[in-house]
Amino acid sequence: MIIALNEEKLVAACLTLAKQDEDLANIFQRFGKPPLWAREPGFATLVHIILEQQVSVASAKSAFDKLVKFVEILTPKNLLRLNDAELKAVGFSRQKTGYARGLAEAVLNGKIDLKALESLPDAEVKAELKKLKGIGDWTSDIYLLMALSRPDVMPKGDLALHIAWQKLKNLELRPTSDEFLLIAERWKPFRAVAARLLWHFYLSARKV
């Protein structure tokens, strides 16, 4: 059975984690419930996540908003109508242009069925997405977490999560990607909720 988070399940999972983990309990008590940060499943969201690879959330959102304004409706066909210069103008790098076009072509030729992913287990969703060039662990994890609202996904290599953990624990060194995935094992089956709490801490602590 595929389980998806909603606001009610998010709160329940936060309370469960707070009982098990003092650090997450402190975040929850200090800053409250994290946002669900849900996104609509499908092509447009995957393009948005591709734009977020290795750049700030704000920078990616600016590029995505320009893209949507330019094409009005972001579909595979509409994206493929844009040339290199047009994509560069809205904020695509050469690499990301190739990734987005590859995704658009894969959707149009039936190489991937994004709707069908919604009913697959996490590991199968990741395997299907990672067949596409430019979509690796982080991109597929974020899609699972935000678009499909899966509760037990920890984005591999997410810098903000590593920084949040370093600050939360007052560590001299930031954990590596592999080290952090091992740390996250303690939060099963709610690793995606732990990630939301840590992002919430990362963003909220910067405002204090």
Can you say where each PLM-predicted feature lies in the sequence?
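Short alpha-helical scaffolding segments that buttress acidic/His motifs in well-ordered protein cores
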Residues: 46-51, 100-104, 143, 194-198
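Alpha-helical scaffolds flanking conserved acidic
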Residues: 11, 44-45, 81, 126
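Structural motif
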Residues: 36-44, 91-95, 184-192
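Alpha-helical ds-nucleic-acid-binding substructure associated with the helix-hairpin-helix region
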Residues: 4, 23, 27, 55-56, ...
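Alpha-helix C-capping/helix-to-loop hinge sites
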Residues: 34, 49, 53-54, 70, ...
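A positional/architectural concept
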Residues: 12, 19-65, 69-72
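C-terminal accessory module of base-excision DNA glycosylases/AP lyases that mediates lesion recognition
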Residues: 1-34, 122-123, 137-208
